[in-house]
């Protein structure tokens, strides 16, 4: 099994060499090199041409009754790192600012143990590309990556949380993370001279009405217990101060703890946009893009076992948490397979996920390996 020092060395290499989603070529090769150092007797690797940077590693069980899968993401973010660390990103404007370097390292640590100590059930470790931007889990699933002996019965995953103490495991039954839907809208009117508004169709006025009206979608259409968020984060329009804009482009995000809530919000957003476009004489282009970012819903059966184990395991610091409005494309896999996702604390409370100063506490790596490894061993006895 990989030592603490080896795990940290691996993590620092991954952190220094981040790659954007669907471009994780060197990451893929590095992972293969590390896996090649493990005992190979019960180990096989599956790749598919449609998602070439993905890796699905299987360890055959000694007396398998099911196949248990662990997922880790691989990709980094288009962020310029500002930590000043000795092992800071070598790649300009690319950074592991969401902890995927930690996730991969924990997965390798777990894999190294079970490669040496054959598990009772079959174990899959899915190194997934493109969590951040291209919903790699859904793409791998849709391409037929999970078939035959590579078809999981249960799926598990973790995500670092800088607001929790290093090594703390946190989860809950039901929804852990929200679903997310990207929104892009264009109002297309007719430009004209600012002095003659009657001869133009002002797209800024139409789009501004949309932005203010859409704030009622959550407050008047979504069950307050379920929660929801509609945020308009980008508004582009106009070419000069004395020209009426003939086009306005809006981008935003929609988030909900339930898929039904997501569908309610998209329905009402579309209705508002169409109504405003009609009232202001605008052509409307509207696009929603959810992909794999469905709510992460922890299955009751597996999560009951997960919580019971973590609460009672020696050396594990565990807590129940409230759901979070962040989105994770494990949501798609959690809707296809039974399973559980959890937080892994990395103790950097001054910096959030996606911060250019994020600096996780590396002591969380070994604690994460031990906690998840112990859980998998216990799960395979049931």
UniProtKB/Swiss-Prot annotation:
EC code: 3.5.1.47
GO biological process: diaminopimelate biosynthetic process; lysine biosynthetic process via diaminopimelate
Swiss-Prot/TrEMBL keywords: Amino-acid biosynthesis, Diaminopimelate biosynthesis, Hydrolase, Lysine biosynthesis
Catalytic activity: N-acetyl-(2S,6S)-2,6-diaminopimelate + H2O = (2S,6S)-2,6-diaminopimelate + acetate
InterPro entries: AcetylDAP_deacetylase, Amidohydrolase, Bact_exopeptidase_dim_dom, Peptidase_M20, Peptidase_M20_dimer
Entry similarity comment: Belongs to the peptidase M20A family. N-acetyldiaminopimelate deacetylase subfamily.
Primary enzyme class: hydrolase
UniProt organism field: Oenococcus oeni (strain ATCC BAA-331 / PSU-1)
UniProt-recorded name of the protein: N-acetyldiaminopimelate deacetylase
Annotated SUPFAM superfamilies: Bacterial exopeptidase dimerisation domain, Zn-dependent exopeptidases
Signal peptide: none
Job description of the protein: Catalyzes the conversion of N-acetyl-diaminopimelate to diaminopimelate and acetate.
Residues at the active site: 73, 132
């Amino acid at each position: 099994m990989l030592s603490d020092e080896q795990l940290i060395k691996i993590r620092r290499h991954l952190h220094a060499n981040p790659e954007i989603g669907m471009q994780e070529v060197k990451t893929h090769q590095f992972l293969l090199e590390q896996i090649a150092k493990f005992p190979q007797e019960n180990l096989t690797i599956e790749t598919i041409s449609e998602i070439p940077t993905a890796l699905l590693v299987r360890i055959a069980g000694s007396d398998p009754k099911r196949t248990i899968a662990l997922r880790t993401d691989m990709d980094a973010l288009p962020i310029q790192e500002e930590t000043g660390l000795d092992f800071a990103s070598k790649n300009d404007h690319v950074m592991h600012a969401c902890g995927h370097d930690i996730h991969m390292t924990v997965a390798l640590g777990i894999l190294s143990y079970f490669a040496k100590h054959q598990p009772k059930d079959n174990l899959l470790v899915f190194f997934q590309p493109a969590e951040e931007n291209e919903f790699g889990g859904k793409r791998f699933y849709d391409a037929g990556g999970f078939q035959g002996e590579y078809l999981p019965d249960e799926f598990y995953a973790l995500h670092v949380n800088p607001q929790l103490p290093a090594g703390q495991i946190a989860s809950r039954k039901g929804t852990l993370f929200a679903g997310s839907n990207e929104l892009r809208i264009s109002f297309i009117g007719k430009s004209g001279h600012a002095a003659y508004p009657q001869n133009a169709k002002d797209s800024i006025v139409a789009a501004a009405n949309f932005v203010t009206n859409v704030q009622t979608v959550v407050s008047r259409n979504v069950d307050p217990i379920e929660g929801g968020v509609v945020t308009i984060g980008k508004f582009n329009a106009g070419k000069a101060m004395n020209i009426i804009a003939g086009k306005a482009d809006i981008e935003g995000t929609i988030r909900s703890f339930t898929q039904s809530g997501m569908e309610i919000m998209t329905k009402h957003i579309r209705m508002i946009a169409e109504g405003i476009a009609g009232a202001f004489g605008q052509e409307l282009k509207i696009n929603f893009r959810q992909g794999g970012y469905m709510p992460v819903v922890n299955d009751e059966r597996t999560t009951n076992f997960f919580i019971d184990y973590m609460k009672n395991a020696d050396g594990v610091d565990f807590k129940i948490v409230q759901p979070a409005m962040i989105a994770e494309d494990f949501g798609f896999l959690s809707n296809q397979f039974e399973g559980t996702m959890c937080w892994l604390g990395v103790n950097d409370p001054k910096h959030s996920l996606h911060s250019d100063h994020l600096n996780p506490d590396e002591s969380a790596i070994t604690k994460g390996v031990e906690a998840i490894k112990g859980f998998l061993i216990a799960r395979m006895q049931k």
